[in-house]
Amino acid sequence: MKTAQRILLTATRLFNEQGERNVTANDIALELDISPGNLYYHFKGKDGILSALFADYYRELASLLAAPLIDDSFLDQSNPLERGWLFLTVLLEVMYQHRFLYLNQSDLMQRYPEIDRGMRRLMALKKRSAAQLATDLLASADAIPPTATPEHIADSMAMTLMYWLSFEQFAGESLSAQQSIHRAVLQVLSHCAPYLGEKQGDFFAECELINTRLLEKSSS
């Protein structure tokens, strides 16, 4: 593995574990057992590392958010709820791998204009995907009140996506990556739960049971 890639991987791990604010370029070099000069040869300090990490993250997430959510061939799933569940799982896996961006996002957006612009664009893409997902899920709903438009529900879903990792940090619960992602998916889909049809409602109930079992396993 090339040194530049090792630097990015190590920086991501340290940022996730210790918080971006608490990690310096020298900390990253020390962890890699390389000289600070070697690190600066590849990146212009911590700012350069953050810029590269966010650029990679933005490309990956934007590509996922461009997915055709209402296409039955997407993820080979014809059931809208299963398709949405799998899509959100993949999306949240990427977000979890770069969770330091969400644990300190307001501060990062204030300090780095490129991150501010990128995060705002990603929020718009998340809202668009959430609206598609809500439209797909509510197509077979039993009854939808006039105020429960896909756009209204999408706002709540996108907000949960944007701030869930930060909420978990403040909650202080020790969850594995799988448990955290699973619960986040459940929370996002819960905004559509009151309007799901019988078949999808049964599937959602099963998802809740899976989530409960995972949490019980982690506490035992």
Task: State what each model feature region is.
Residues 52, 67-97:
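Hydrophobic alpha-helical connector segments
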Residues 3-11, 28, 53-57, 61, ...:
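Generic hydrophobic, amphipathic alpha-helix propensity
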Residues 95-117, 133-136:
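Amphipathic alpha-helical segments used for helix-helix packing
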Residues 53, 57, 61, 84-87, ...:
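Hydrophobic/aromatic residues within well-ordered alpha-helical segments
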Residues 6, 14-52:
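Helix-turn-helix
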Residues 68-76, 102-109, 137, 141, ...:
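Secondary-structure edge/capping motif, primarily at the C-terminal ends of alpha-helices
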Residues 114-140, 151-166, 183-194:
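Amphipathic alpha-helical packing segments from all-alpha helical-bundle domains
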Residues 170-220:
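C-terminal peripheral helix-coil segments that are non-catalytic and often amphipathic
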